[in-house]
C-alpha cells in the first residue's frame, strides 16, 4: 500500500483479525476516511469513539453495567460482605471524586444501604471468625462516610474496629490472618487490616491515643517484612507460620515456598495506604517509606522487560508461568502513586507508565457492548488451611493449597476479577491526574 494514492472512504465492516502484532505505522497521507463497524482485532472490539474519555470512568461504568447492583459485584449471586467488593468500590468512589458523576456515588452508597442494618449489623459478617478479609471494606466505608454520613455506617465501622482491637496475634504482636489460619501472617492480611486500623484510630480513639495504634501498625509492617523476606531472592514470601508446623511451611523458616505476585501487591498497596493515614509529622513514617522503597526496588527488577508486566509467581521462571493482571495493576498503581507522593524517583514513574501501558495493550479488551474488560486475572490463591484445632478439624484440611508453583498454576484465570479491576481504576486515576501518556489500544 506504500505506492497507493487517493484511497479514501474505506469501510471495514464485520471483520475479525487475530495474531495482529504491534509495529510502527507510516502515515503517508495518501489514504483517509477509514470507517470501522464491528471490527475485532486480537479479540478486542475497535471503537472510533470510545464512550468515555478516561479509563477510570470507562472501567467503572463497565462494572456498573455488568453488575447493576453494587452488592453483586465480583460475580456475587446474592448480597455478600466481601473485601473484593470493597476493593472495587473504593476506587470507584475516587473516580466520583475526580469526575463528579453522581451515578457512581449512588452506586457506592447502595452497598452499605443493603449490607448494614440500622443497628450496625453487617450481613454476612461474623465477628468471631476474626477474619482480616472482612475488615478491608471498612476502609471504603470510612472514605464514603465523609460524603454519606449515615449512622449505620458509623456503627458498622465501630464493629470492624473492635474486631481489629481484639484480633488474635502472633507472639510478636502481628495479626493472625484469620482464626482458621491461626498463628499465620499473610502479606494479604496487611492490606486487609492495617490501613483501616491506622485511619480509624483517631476517629474512634481520639488523636492523642491514636499514636499507640500507629506505632502498632508500623511494628506489624516491620515484623512482617522480617518474617516474610527471603534474602536469597530479594523478594517476600506469600506467608509465614509462627509454629513452622503447617504443611506448606518451611520447617526452618516458617515461610511458604514462593513469592506470589498478588500477595506482594497487597503488601505494597497497604504501605501506601498506611502512609496516607499517618500524619506528616509522625516520627516513624520513614520506616514505612523505607520498606516501601525496598519492595518497589525489588519488584522493578523482576518486571518483564518486553511488556512491563509481572508474572503470577515472581521467583519462578517456567513456561507455565503467566503474566497476571491483578498484580500488574497493583504494582502500576503503587509505582505511580509512590512517585507522585515523593516516595520514589522518576525512574519508578517510568516503570509505572510502562506497566500501565502494558496492561492497556495486553489485558484490556473492548467488548461489543462498548464495555471494557480486564483479562488474565488470577481468581484466587491461598494456603491450606491445615489441621489446626479447634479452628480447623481434620475434615476441613485443604492439602491442595500447598504453596507449590504447580498449585499456583492450577488456580483459575478469569476476566474482571475485582482484585484487579479496583487497582486498575486506581492506576488509571494516577495516570489521568498526573497527565501521563496512555497507549492506544
Model-identified regions with their sequence ranges:
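Extracellular parallel beta-helix/beta-solenoid repeat domains
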Residues: 1-48
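CBM-like carbohydrate-recognition segments
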Residues: 26, 47-86, 98-108, 114-138, ...
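Alpha-helical scaffold segments in carbohydrate-active enzymes
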Residues: 62, 91-94, 114, 159, ...
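Extended ligand-binding groove/face enriched in aromatic
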Residues: 106-109, 115-250, 254, 366, ...
Amino acid at each position: 500500500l506504500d505506492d497507493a494514492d487517493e484511497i479514501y472512504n474505506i469501510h471495514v465492516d464485520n471483520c475479525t483479525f487475530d495474531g495482529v502484532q504491534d509495529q510502527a505505522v507510516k502515515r503517508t497521507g495518501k489514504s483517509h476516511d477509514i470507517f470501522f463497524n464491528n471490527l475485532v482485532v486480537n479479540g478486542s472490539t475497535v471503537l472510533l469513539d470510545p464512550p468515555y474519555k478516561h479509563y477510570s470512568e470507562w472501567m467503572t461504568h463497565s462494572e456498573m453495567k455488568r453488575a447493576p447492583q453494587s452488592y453483586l459485584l465480583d460475580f456475587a449471586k446474592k448480597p455478600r460482605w466481601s473485601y473484593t467488593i470493597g476493593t472495587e468500590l473504593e476506587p470507584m468512589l475516587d473516580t466520583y471524586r475526580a469526575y463528579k458523576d453522581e451515578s457512581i456515588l449512588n452506586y457506592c452508597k447502595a452497598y452499605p444501604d443493603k449490607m448494614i442494618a440500622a443497628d450496625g449489623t453487617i450481613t454476612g459478617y461474623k465477628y468471631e471468625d476474626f477474619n482480616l478479609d472482612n475488615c478491608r471494606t471498612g476502609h471504603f466505608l470510612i472514605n464514603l462516610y465523609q460524603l454519606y454520613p449515615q449512622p449505620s455506617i458509623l456503627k458498622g465501622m465501630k464493629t470492624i474496629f473492635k474486631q481489629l482491637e481484639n484480633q488474635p496475634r502472633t507472639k510478636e504482636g502481628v495479626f493472625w490472618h484469620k482464626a482458621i489460619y491461626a498463628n499465620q501472617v499473610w502479606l494479604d492480611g496487611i492490606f486487609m487490616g492495617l490501613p483501616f486500623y491506622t485511619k480509624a484510630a483517631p476517629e474512634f480513639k481520639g488523636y492523642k491515643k491514636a499514636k499507640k495504634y500507629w506505632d502498632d501498625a508500623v511494628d506489624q509492617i516491620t515484623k512482617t517484612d522480617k518474617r516474610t523476606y527471603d534474602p536469597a531472592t530479594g523478594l517476600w514470601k506469600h506467608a509465614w507460620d509462627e509454629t513452622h508446623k503447617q504443611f506448606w511451611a518451611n520447617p526452618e523458616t516458617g515461610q511458604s515456598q514462593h513469592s506470589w505476585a498478588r500477595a506482594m501487591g497487597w503488601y505494597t498497596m497497604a504501605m501506601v495506604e498506611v502512609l496516607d493515614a499517618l500524619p506528616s509529622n509522625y516520627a516513624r513514617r520513614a520506616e514505612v517509606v523505607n520498606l516501601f522503597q525496598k519492595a518497589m526496588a525489588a519488584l522493578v527488577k523482576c518486571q518483564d522487560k518486553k511488556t512491563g508486566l509481572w508474572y503470577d509467581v515472581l521467583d519462578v521462571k517456567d513456561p507455565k508461568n503467566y503474566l497476571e493482571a491483578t498484580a500488574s495493576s497493583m504494582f502500576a498503581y503503587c509505582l505511580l502513586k509512590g512517585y507522585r507522593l515523593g516516595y520514589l524517583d522518576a525512574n519508578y514513574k517510568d516503570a509505572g507508565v510502562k506497566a500501565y501501558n502494558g496492561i492497556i495493550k495486553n489485558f484490556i479488551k473492548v467488548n461489543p457492548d462498548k464495555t471494557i474488560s480486564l483479562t488474565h486475572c488470577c481468581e484466587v490463591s491461598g494456603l491450606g488451611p491445615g489441621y489446626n484445632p479447634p479452628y480447623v478439624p481434620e475434615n476441613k484440611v485443604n492439602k491442595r493449597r500447598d504453596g507449590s508453583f504447580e498449585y499456583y498454576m492450577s488456580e483459575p484465570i478469569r476476566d474482571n476479577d475485582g482484585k484487579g479491576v479496583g487497582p486498575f481504576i486506581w492506576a488509571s486515576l494516577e495516570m489521568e491526574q498526573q497527565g501521563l501518556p496512555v497507549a492506544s489500544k
